[in-house]
Amino acid sequence: DMTGPDGKRARTAYTRYQTLELEKEFHFNRYLTRRRRIEIAHALCLSERQIKIWFQNRRMKWKKDNKLKSMSLASAGSAFQP
């Protein structure tokens, strides 16, 4: 847990493999049980906290993407109204 000059924790750089595995897990389940979080942390050599925060961030991205998708569908639908 390296900290920068401002006392903040250094940003975690996930490997391609870790990201792929986390995305795969997220695809099946947007929320993790503590047991599953521990399993993933051990399998990917990450801390439980890193897994928890990755999932929090990913859920926010998912929410934002879905909001944008529904907005673009709504505006596309209204464009075709006679």
From Swiss-Prot:
Mention any Pfam family matching this sequence.
Answer: Homeodomain
Provide the gene name from the record: HOXB5
The free-text function statement in the UniProt record for this protein reads:
Sequence-specific transcription factor which is part of a developmental regulatory system that provides cells with specific positional identities on the anterior-posterior axis.
Organism whose genome encodes this protein: Gallus gallus (Chicken)
* Highest taxon of the lineage: Eukaryota
Question: Under what name is this protein listed?
Answer: Homeobox protein Hox-B5
**Record-level Gene Ontology MF annotations:** DNA binding; DNA-binding transcription factor activity, RNA polymerase II-specific
UniProt family annotation: Belongs to the Antp homeobox family.
Q: Which InterPro entries match?
A: Antp_homeobox, HD, HD_metazoa, Homeobox_CS, Homeodomain-like_sf
Per UniProt, the keywords (alphabetical) are: Developmental protein, DNA-binding, Homeobox, Nucleus, Transcription, Transcription regulation
**Cell compartments where the protein resides:** Nucleus
Gene Ontology cellular-component terms for this entry are: nucleus
Primary residence = nucleus
Ranges annotated as DNA-binding: 7-66
Upper lineage = Eukaryota, Metazoa, Chordata, Craniata, Vertebrata
